[in-house]
From Swiss-Prot:
The gene is ndhG. One of its GO terms (molecular function) is quinone binding. It holds the Pfam family Oxidored_q3. It comes from the Eukaryota. It is a multi-pass membrane protein. Gene3D superfamilies: NADH-ubiquinone/plastoquinone oxidoreductase chain 6, subunit NuoJ. The lineage of its organism: Eukaryota, Viridiplantae, Streptophyta, Embryophyta, Tracheophyta. NDH shuttles electrons from NAD(P)H:plastoquinone, via FMN and iron-sulfur (Fe-S) centers, to quinones in the photosynthetic chain and possibly in a chloroplast respiratory chain. The immediate electron acceptor for the enzyme in this species is believed to be plastoquinone. Couples the redox reaction to proton translocation, and thus conserves the redox energy in a proton gradient. This is NAD(P)H-quinone oxidoreductase subunit 6, chloroplastic. Belongs to the complex I subunit 6 family. It comes from Liriodendron tulipifera.
Length: 176
């Protein structure tokens, strides 16, 4: 998508603020339904990040898979839970909550310093000339299909086996 610079920057700031607010909502909201809806906002913002870089297929796939399936499944699972354990009592922090928040903030600050200290201009994207010609002649969906059936065949099959084992494990645990 060819947007002018200021509009592109405003769009990225809007999506980034949606990500931050949604992430804070997932962590800080005590009602699990509201937390699941905040997770849906985060997943929508992540999928919309792919549109300015002309990755429409990835954006649509993430919307369908994550927001359309995973988040709806989470909302249904939360709705079937017993709501009495989420009362409106005063919630006091425990030692585990303090240690967890300390670890998470230290990881956050280490990531921020690592990202700010990295020289991003030193990273060079190398492509061969025939790859550039191939990218011009085929669409994004065709490129994904070609790479999945040639270069990424083994990792794709391994991921499908892992997902199948996880699904069978979840079904067997649900029956018990």
């Amino acid at each position: 998508m060819d947007l002018p610079g200021p509009i592109h920057d405003i769009l990225l700031v809007f999506l980034g603020s949606g990500l931050i607010l949604g992430g804070l909502g997932v962590v800080l909201l005590t009602n699990p339904i509201y937390s699941a809806f905040s997770l849906g906002l985060v997943l929508v913002c992540i999928s919309l990040f792919h549109i300015p870089s002309n990755s429409y297929f990835v954006a649509a796939a993430q919307l369908l898979i994550y927001v359309g399936a995973v988040n709806v499944l989470i909302v249904f699972a939360v709705m079937f839970m017993n709501g009495s354990e989420y009362s409106k009592d005063l919630y006091l922090w425990t030692v585990g909550d303090g240690v967890t928040s300390l670890v998470c903030t230290s990881i956050l600050f280490s990531l921020i310093t690592t990202i700010s200290d990295t020289s991003w201009y030193g990273i060079i994207w190398t492509t061969r000339s025939n790859q550039i010609i191939e990218q011009d002649l085929t669409s994004n969906v065709q490129q994904i299909g070609i790479h999945l059936s040639t270069d990424f065949y083994l990792p794709f099959e391994l991921i499908s086996i892992i997902l199948l084992v996880a699904l069978i494990g979840a079904i067997s645990m649900a029956r018990q």
